[in-house]
Amino acid sequence: ELEELIPRYLENRRADVEIARVAFARGDMERLRSLGHTIKGTGASYGFTAISEIGYSLERAAANADAEAAGAAISNLERYLNALVIVYVDE
């Protein structure tokens, strides 16, 4: 069930923020593009469309070598993850 998978998924996205910060500091736009692509592809699968949208923003920014937008996407992902509260509802 997703309920069992979501905590690990979110841990991985938090790790991605750190990976992205290192890549950003190195100016590694290809790594940021690839990471953004991965984030974009996984977010919606877990019900986090906002994560997918942020991943898309990071992917596009890095593909266009737009460091300012890439940095903003990384910050947005970190803020989103820090503000996220998960509530499971029995149906």
Question: Where are these predicted regions, by residue range?
Answer:
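Long, amphipathic alpha-helical coiled-coil segments characteristic
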Residues: 1-38, 45, 64, 68-91
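Hydrophobic, amphipathic alpha-helical faces that serve as interaction scaffolds
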Residues: 54-63
